């Protein structure tokens, strides 16, 4: 469950290390975002010479949450931290060319096939 002011790790090679959620997109007064939801983020920590820089405001898709995601069979997949993949503001395609760490199968339903294909492991 990601809400405003939540700090997330970045699971791609866009150059950002830590980001903060500033808005959960999808409906007015929506409070929480889960895996597969798009959020508006600002870069809080970035590496030198990356594709993004500190202070940039972009969109991102949540790929891992500590809260986890419940499957129809009753199982829950949880992670050690919250992570997102930074998206281009216009095309909503990933900015980075590599994804680090596992992602969940729920992204397939949310039309993020590019992230699924780049990920090293899909749970």
From Swiss-Prot:
CDD domains: Ribosomal_uL14. One of its GO terms (cellular component) is cytosolic large ribosomal subunit. PROSITE patterns: RIBOSOMAL_L14 (PS00049). GO terms for biological process: translation. The gene is rplN. This is Large ribosomal subunit protein uL14. GO terms for molecular function: large ribosomal subunit rRNA binding; structural constituent of ribosome. It holds the Pfam family Ribosomal_L14.
């Amino acid at each position: 469950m990601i809400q405003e002011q939540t700090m997330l790790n970045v699971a791609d090679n866009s150059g950002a290390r830590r980001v903060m959620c500033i808005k959960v997109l999808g409906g007015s007064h929506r409070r929480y975002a889960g895996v597969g939801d798009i959020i508006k983020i600002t870069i809080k920590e970035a590496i030198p010479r990356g594709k993004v820089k500190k202070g940039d405001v972009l969109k991102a898709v949540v790929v891992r949450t500590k809260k986890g995601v419940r499957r129809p069979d009753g199982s829950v997949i949880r992670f050690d931290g919250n992570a997102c993949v930074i998206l281009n503001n216009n095309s909503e395609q990933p900015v980075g060319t590599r994804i680090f760490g596992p992602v969940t199968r729920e992204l397939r339903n949310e039309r993020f096939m590019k992230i699924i294909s780049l990920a090293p492991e899909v749970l």
